[in-house]
């Protein structure tokens, strides 16, 4: 059994998500201690618990310590099987963080896996669902992974109630990813949404983002989406499609924050990611790590983050030395797979 120290590096939920996903894929039992030790409210949160329970279902696993607040978890997987997954986080817990745990494992099932998750679609400290469906999935397609993520209903903090449905196909053909420098930006796209709010909120977010991005001198199309849910909220995701991959930026609205500031923030984040000229933004970088171990390849990221370094550490705890990292945290960098699994 592999023991993982949950307080390593940035000591967040990602250690847990990647560990249980890798355990499911490899069939290797794992014990995780000091779960989220560096966080103000340590231990398992509802979104972590539901990700674990979904992976337990997929892997027919035996699990100990699976409850909110738990600081230690034992996960003993049996056989990975394709099953339908239905999760209600019960709070505005992040749907995309649950998916970050599920996606690497689901693609190793022998048949298509469908999922339906209820919770937060656009919440702080996690990628918005539009980022996952338009940036992450676009990159995964390049390595041979096919799937879909659809927003049925938005969910914001504190009420949640968002619904996301989708599926992934089995990863039958693993293709190497070589994503170094882009040579041109083809277009900018985006989605600006307002839920239980006037339509002008989404329109103003979109307009402000577009004004900021005009300097790139490429076609820009940011569509607005107005919807109803159980609570109000707004946000915007913008992405640049290059001749390599897509890079993204996003921002969330909140009470008292002008829509123009929200739009400008998302655009500025995208501009920051594009600046180094590397194909992979800092958010996608850490998301790709578990997949790259199996596909092989090389990625140049706009910024090496603690998240990325921590994810590499977890993957290598299971699989041995896989990656060579050139660069320091907080700076652009290069990640090369020196041994694919």
Swiss-Prot record:
UniProt-annotated catalytic positions: 307
Pfam families: RTC, RTC_insert
Transmembrane spans: none
Record protein name field: RNA 3'-terminal phosphate cyclase
EC number: 6.5.1.4
This protein's GO CC annotations: cytoplasm
Binding site for ATP: 100, 283-287
Residue stretches in coiled coil: none
Keywords tagged on the record: ATP-binding, Cytoplasm, Ligase, Nucleotide-binding
